[in-house]
C-alpha cells in the first residue's frame, strides 16, 4: 500500500484497500509537526520562492532571445506577465507570513544566507507589489481582456483588481482592533 499520495497519479485510490498513513493534513492531528516536517507551510514557502526565482530567470532569458519566433511585442507581453506573477507570489508570501523578503533579481544558488535580503516592513512589501503591478500595466503587455485560447492569462483588469486586494490586506493590518 502506498504511504503517501502522488499528485496527479491517483489510480492507486481505486484499490479496495488503500491506507494513507502520513498526509499533510494529519501533521497536527498525529503530532508529526516538527522543524523537519512542516507540512503545508514548507510546501507553500518553497512554491512561492521557486515561482519568484523562475520569473526572474525567465526575464533574464528573455533578454537574450533574438529570433523571428519571439517578436518585441511578445517579449513585452511576457515581461508584463512575469512582473504580474512576481507581484502575485510576493502577495502570497505576505498573506501567508506577513512582512517578508523582497526579491528584486535572481539570487545565485551559491549565495550564503547572509547575502539574502532581510525581512522588509509591510509598507515596503505593499509598495513593491504595487510597483511590480504598475510595471506590468505600464509596459503595455497586458491587454484589457483575452479571448479564445488565451483566456485566463493575466490582464490589465486583473492587475488592477489584484492591486485593490493588496491594499485591502494592508488596510486590514492597520485598521483591525
Show the residue positions of the predicted features.
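Short, well-structured active-site flanking segments
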Residues: 94-106
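Primarily recognizes Gram-negative and organellar outer-membrane beta-barrels
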Residues: 12, 17-19, 23
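Conserved small/polar residues in nucleotide/adenosyl-binding loops
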Residues: 174-177
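Acidic, glycine-rich segments characteristic of secretory precursors and extracytoplasmic regions
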Residues: 1-14, 57, 123
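Flexible, solvent-exposed coil segments and beta strand-coil junctions
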Residues: 109-110
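Conserved, well-structured interaction surfaces
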Residues: 21-97, 113-127, 132-151
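Amphipathic alpha-helical protein-interaction segments enriched in hydrophobic
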Residues: 152-162
